[in-house]
């Protein structure tokens, strides 16, 4: 789905309980088109390949991209906001189709390949497989060096939901790709390994200072998954401060 010029959103259905039961869990994926040299694209959080209810998430993503005239082999960079499988599992498959490098923060990669691997071994006993993280590039706080890129992106360290969670800010479009930092009326979970209530509050306050016209969240929690308009976004931050922060 095209939002504005060169910005596409692929929202995973799952607003109502019936939809969540039917479609299962997966993240929203976003694409910045024609943003790299030779007209290549950046995809943020490609999601899963197949989820817990056997929905073929990656196939669905590729079909929706094709409807917008976007070919998966024209992807030039894959960015993970964080290393939870519902956000990154499809990354290696897309890399195989496009030869695009995978980028994640170093803190997130190190956490998931140490503590995360211990957790993964425990989950494997229940038949749950957590793919390993293999990064080609590490994201650091500050402007992302994309060479001869058309889009200037800024990486923001936003820990709290996970230790190395990042958000991506596109100043030209005033768009924030927030991953699982903040949703419509809620925040990312902090009651999981690597989560921190203190850090997620600090991270939300950090991004709330930006000029944002498009808040692009990782899930449709609270609906909609995209909050548009500076005043609507400000109201959402205010709501989260008043009604969610005290209970984290």
Stretches found by the model and what they are:
Residues 22, 35-36, 144, 158-160:
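Short polar/acidic secondary-structure junctions
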Residues 48-144, 232-243:
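Active-site HxH/HxHxD metal-binding segment of metal-dependent hydrolases
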Residues 19-22, 133-136, 157-159:
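Short Gly/Pro-enriched turn/cap motifs at secondary-structure boundaries
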Residues 2-68, 167-181:
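Conserved beta-strand hairpin/beta-sheet module of binuclear metal-dependent hydrolase folds
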Residues 7-16, 123-126, 148-151:
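Short Pro/Gly-enriched beta-strand edge/turn motifs at strand-loop
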Residues 41, 48-51, 55, 118, ...:
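Metallo-beta-lactamase
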Residues 36, 68-73, 146-151, 170-171, ...:
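Glycine-rich phosphate-binding loop signature in dinucleotide/nucleotide-binding domains
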Residues 8-10, 79, 103, 137-139, ...:
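Hydrophobic/aromatic beta-strand patches that form the interior of the parallel beta-sheet core
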């Amino acid at each position: 789905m095209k939002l504005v010029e060169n910005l596409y959103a692929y929202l995973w259905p799952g607003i109502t309980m019936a939809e969540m039961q039917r479609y299962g869990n997966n993240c929203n994926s976003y694409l910045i088109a024609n943003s790299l040299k030779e007209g290549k694209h950046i995809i943020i959080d490609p999601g899963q390949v197949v989820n817990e209810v056997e929905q073929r998430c990656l196939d669905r993503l590729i079909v929706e991209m094709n409807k917008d005239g976007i070919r998966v082999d024209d992807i030039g960079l894959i960015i993970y906001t964080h290393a939870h499988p519902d956000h990154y599992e499809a990354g290696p498959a897309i890399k195989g189709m496009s030869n695009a490098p995978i980028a994640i923060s170093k803190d997130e990669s190190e956490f998931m390949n140490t503590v995360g691997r211990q957790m993964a071994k425990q989950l494997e006993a229940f038949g749950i497989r957590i793919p390993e993280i293999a990064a080609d590039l590490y994201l650091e706080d500050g402007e992302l060096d994309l060479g001869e890129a058309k889009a200037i992106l800024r990486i923001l360290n936003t820990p709290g939901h996970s230790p190395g969670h990042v958000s991506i800010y596109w100043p030209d479009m005033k768009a924030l790709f927030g991953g699982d930092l903040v949703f419509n009326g809620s925040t990312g979970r902090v009651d999981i390994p690597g989560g921190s209530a203190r850090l997620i509050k600090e991270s939300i306050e950090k991004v709330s200072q930006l000029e944002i016209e498009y808040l692009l969240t990782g899930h449709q929690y609270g609906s909609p998954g995209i909050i548009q308009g500076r005043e609507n976004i400000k109201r959402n931050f205010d709501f989260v401060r008043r009604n969610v922060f005290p209970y984290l």
